[in-house]
Amino acid sequence: MRLFKLLIISVTILFLLVTAISLLIPFHIRISRATNVLATPTEVWQQVDDMHEWRNWNPFFSGVSPDKINYSDTVNGKPQTMNVSGTSIQWKEMKRDEHIAIMQKPGFRPILNGWKCISHTGSDSITVQWYMDFHLRWYPWEKFSSLLFEQSYGPKMEEGLGNIKKMAEADRTSFN
């Protein structure tokens, strides 16, 4: 009986300690990547706004077959919602310099994906930023797993921005 009490007390203290340490990790995580592109915001938004184009530049969709993607809520010929194997992606807002989409996977919290085009006065290039916002619960396993987000999402975001850069700059050179 003493051994059982010791085990229960030890597990409880360990859980409380791990939970207390996890509270040092923020509840809001933003992963962000940026690159300079020799293009106008319009040329960048042509790639980002059209969900049909995402398979061409977004590495998160490079291995997805077209028959697993369902588009809906079309406005001006461009879908506003995309479903990929149960994951829903929907445009939340499109401002002049920032576009935000919500990615919702069943059983998980929504992830905000945002793209910004930042113009520089006197420059022929813009900075394109892609960010992902994660809002975490207090659960220790969620908090500690967030430490791996940078390594799992960051390189793919860089690759995606590189693809956008190539496509937007290629569009620009084909017009000149």
Describe each PLM feature range:
Residues 134-159:
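A short acidic/glycine-rich loop-to-helix N-cap element
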Residues 4-8, 42, 49, 53-59, ...:
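Glycine-rich portal/gate segments that line the openings of hydrophobic small-molecule binding cavities
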Residues 37, 41, 47, 150-157:
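Solvent-exposed, acidic/flexible segments
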Residues 5-23:
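Hydrophobic membrane-insertion alpha-helices, especially the h-region
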Residues 26-42:
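Alpha-helical transmembrane signal-anchor/signal-peptide segments
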Residues 132-134, 168:
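Short beta-strand segments enriched in hydrophobic/aromatic residues
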Residues 36, 127-131:
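Soluble periplasmic/extracytoplasmic beta-strand elements of cell-envelope proteins
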